[in-house]
Design a protein with these regions (language model features):
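A short acidic, leucine-rich amphipathic alpha-helix
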Residues: 36, 49-55
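Long, charge-rich, low-complexity intrinsically disordered regions
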Residues: 2-3, 7-10, 89-93, 116, ...
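Amphipathic alpha-helical dimerization/coiled-coil segments
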Residues: 98-131
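Short helix-capping/hinge SLiMs at alpha-helix to coil transitions
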Residues: 26-30, 41-46
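Short amphipathic alpha-helical interaction segments
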Residues: 58-74
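A short, conserved structural fragment
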Residues: 72-84
Length: 131
């Protein structure tokens, strides 16, 4: 999964695998969206309201709602309830579960490297829009 180099300070990530970089580029639009996905994946047994997600992730309600809708639109989570009170739940999908698991592990162990990759992708998207 993650290529590691061993040093005096312990394991240091050399770089994220290309498959993980590609998954981030294709599927992850922000750090808070990744945290939302990981949070729901870590708690698949129940549905969550946007208010609950925002509280657990120390995010604004607006950001939580935006991330939840984006993840729903891409098929990572389902939505039950009403338009006024939606509830979201992680959907296990065999074709992406291993990528999400690898990304969650990388984010837990090599947070700065994953965040750097997300910002690299965001900056490239922004530059392409302005050209």
């Amino acid at each position: 999964m993650i290529h590691q180099l061993s040093g005096r300070e312990g394991n240091v990530v050399a770089e994220l695998p290309d498959t993980l970089k590609a998954f981030i580029c294709k599927e992850i639009s922000s750090v808070h969206e990744l945290e939302t996905l990981i949070f729901l994946r870590d708690h698949p047994e129940r549905s969550w309201s946007p208010t609950e997600v925002a509280a657990h992730l120390f995010a604004s309600l607006h950001i939580a709602e935006k991330d939840l809708e984006s993840l729903k639109d891409r098929g990572f989570i389902s939505c039950d309830g009403t338009d006024e009170l939606p509830y979201y739940q992680y959907i296990s999908r065999s074709e992406v579960d291993s990528s999400i698991n690898d990304l969650a592990t990388a984010y837990r162990e090599f947070r700065v490297k994953v965040i750097g990759q997300i910002f690299f992708v965001e900056n490239n998207r922004s530059a392409k829009r302005h050209n």
